[in-house]
């Protein structure tokens, strides 16, 4: 139960107060003693992070100047209870923007926002500041350069988050003036800074997985990134403007405002500075967005299927690809003129502070894998593993070039297997002959000759090959004997499954193997190596599910026979 506010205390409420930007706002409000702060969030109790111990928030909680109340915005009675005695509400709560679940986003961003408005009116809150997003004017297709608040909402938004934030924003602006309530909307662009749990951690995870070397798009798209302390400052400016009275509050109320650092920068240059500062490789390889989009759709579809079995929310989604390849810059002149907003931390200083705050994620701090990965062990750990896992980039690119050459010269022409093989042997013979007649030096460069020993099969290799053939023959004979006895149903089904798989594989053309199989081989093992834990957990869940039903099926099929 929240203690009642005394006459001398001025209380404000921050919904979603344990979120990234909200934490910085709470700390600013408490540090400068602007308000007593009531944090409203979903968790049943507040749990301070280690770095918050003995800090401003910890001291505020102990002194009573900061309160925590558990509240679900979808329950109006809980919202009303949280707002009792408050003069100002900073409505910052929202689901993760990467979760493209319309029902969840709508229930919080629209229905929850309506509950916030109604509760403010019911308990007499004077000012309501809503944290919106620049994505409310983004259609996911067309870039935005120096966008202003005069831009209309698009017919179709990039995702459910953007669409529902736009609906919530409309509700907030229409509520201005109800029972004396003054409202406005803040649209902070691409927030970054200490305490971020999405941008920098995702960037570092990509770097450690070897994916940060890629640039999606042409790399020239501009962005407005906003340091988190400037976002908190913008909320304070909005509250002060609404509280000023007269023309200032009249002009400020019922409006939306873009908030930026007022220093546009190329998106990939910003990412490069963060990566470079943390000791990782800068992105340099450009991949067109139209190539990444089908992959992103496939990842999103996979998540819809495997999400219930523990798959984490993917960062590569169609909406993210659009965001990474488009320009998005905004004009903050209106916020400057009507709210008195100006950034208090410059962009480069914000980047420096952010890098310093994530020192535990630097390249030298990551734990090393002991021994080869499971994917490498599956592939034998030799040259094949190094090639398919891109360990030796030169070797991998040479292998890809050779396979592409084989495809276009022998497979794509529609040749039969015998014709393709004869052509390949012809090319090999011509190459070896010409290579043999070349002089040892050409224009001062030494020509490395292929020694005859390369084509010689040693006695040990011959012995090993013979043992492999004999072992395979004995294994086959043993399997046939087991089948002849007719007792092992499990083994019978395994044999049937393998033979059916081979028959299906035999129906696949050489063309399909090259076009579909080889690209998958060069990607599947690499993906498995990078996401080994996640994939293994999904496999374990599937096996557990299969085992639960295996005994029932077996009993139904063969139980009656045993009873007979």
From Swiss-Prot:
The reaction(s) this protein catalyses: a 3beta-hydroxysteroid-4alpha-carboxylate + NAD(+) = a 3-oxosteroid + CO2 + NADH; 4alpha-carboxy-4beta,14alpha-dimethyl-9beta,19-cyclo-5alpha-ergost-24(24(1))-en-3beta-ol + NAD(+) = cycloeucalenone + CO2 + NADH
Keywords: Endoplasmic reticulum, Glycoprotein, Lipid biosynthesis, Lipid metabolism, Membrane, NAD, Oxidoreductase, Steroid biosynthesis, Steroid metabolism, Sterol biosynthesis, Sterol metabolism, Transmembrane, Transmembrane helix
Chain residues that bind NAD(+): 16-21, 161, 165
Pathway: Steroid biosynthesis; zymosterol biosynthesis; zymosterol from lanosterol: step 4/6
Glycan-carrying positions: 146, 158, 474
Pfam families for the chain: 3Beta_HSD (PF01073), Reticulon (PF02453)
The protein's Enzyme Commission number: 1.1.1.418
Protein location: Endoplasmic reticulum membrane
Single GO molecular function: 3-beta-hydroxysteroid dehydrogenase (NAD+)/C4-decarboxylase activity
GO terms, biological process: auxin transport; plant organ development; regulation of transporter activity; sterol biosynthetic process
Known function: 3beta-hydroxysteroid-dehydrogenase/decarboxylase involved in sterol synthesis. Catalyzes the formation of 3-oxosteroids from 3beta-hydroxysteroids-4alpha-carboxylate. Involved in the regulation of inflorescence internodes and leaves growth, probably by affecting auxin transporter activity possibly by altering sterol composition in the membranes.
Name of the protein described by the UniProt record: 3beta-hydroxysteroid-dehydrogenase/decarboxylase isoform 2
